[in-house]
């Protein structure tokens, strides 16, 4: 009876240690799983657009990571901290300023536009809380996310 409990406990420990790493999900080698998605940290800095393109080409359905809960963010931050030290990491959120619905404070419609050719993309840090934005053309590490 003691041996049965020991073996059962051992199997439970193995199962729990593998859950959340992609073993229970159908993630490619080197990718980690969480909540029906697979994630991978890439340590070669790229612009936001190049990182998104890289993610799209790396595996079917992959994009820069989108974060939908504090638990998912904690998972990604932990994954990043295992791979990189304090780094700026692109996520899949961006705002192209010249494509927004803008209006003047006096209520007049915006007809004339003279936007600079700059867009802003969102990044996070593995050591600082909160999301920040910066020019998309700047280089940063990134995390890709794909359906499991």
From Swiss-Prot:
This protein's GO CC annotations: extracellular region
InterPro entries per record: C-type_lectin-like, C-type_lectin-like/link_sf, C-type_lectin/snaclec_domain, C-type_lectin_CS, CTDL_fold
Gene Ontology MF: a single term: toxin activity
Disulfide bonds: 27-38, 55-144, 121-136
Location(s) in or outside the cell: Secreted
Ion transport is among the record's keywords: no
Main location: secreted
Domain C-type lectin: 34-145
Signal peptide: 1-24
Summary of the tissues where the protein is detected: Expressed by the venom gland.
Keyword presence, Secreted: yes
Keyword entries, A-Z: Disulfide bond, Glycoprotein, Hemostasis impairing toxin, Secreted, Signal, Toxin
PROSITE patterns xref list: C_TYPE_LECTIN_1, C_TYPE_LECTIN_2
Annotated SUPFAM superfamilies: C-type lectin-like (SSF56436)
Glycosylated residue positions: 57, 60
Assembly information from the UniProt record: Heterodimer; disulfide-linked.
Family: Belongs to the snaclec family.
Known function: Interferes with one step of hemostasis (modulation of platelet aggregation, or coagulation cascade, for example).
Other comment: Shows greater sequence similarity to the beta than alpha subunits compared to other heterodimer snaclecs.
Name under which the protein is recorded: Snaclec B9
Species of the source: Macrovipera lebetinus
């Amino acid at each position: 009876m003691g041996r049965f409990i020991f073996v059962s406990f051992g199997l439970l420990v193995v199962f729990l240690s593998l859950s959340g790493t992609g073993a229970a999900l159908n993630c490619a080698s080197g990718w980690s799983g969480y909540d029906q998605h697979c994630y991978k940290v890439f340590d070669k800095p790229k612009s936001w657009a190049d990182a998104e393109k890289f993610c799209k080409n790396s595996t079917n359905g992959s994009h820069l990571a989108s974060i939908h809960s504090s638990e998912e963010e904690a998972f990604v931050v932990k994954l990043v901290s295992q791979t990189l030290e304090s780094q700026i990491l692109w996520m899949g959120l961006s705002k192209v300023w010249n494509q927004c619905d803008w209006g003047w404070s006096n209520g007049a419609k915006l007809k004339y536009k003279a936007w600079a050719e700059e867009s802003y993309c969102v990044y996070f840090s593995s050591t600082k809380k909160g999301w920040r934005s910066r020019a998309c053309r700047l280089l940063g590490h990134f995390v890709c996310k794909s359906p499991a």
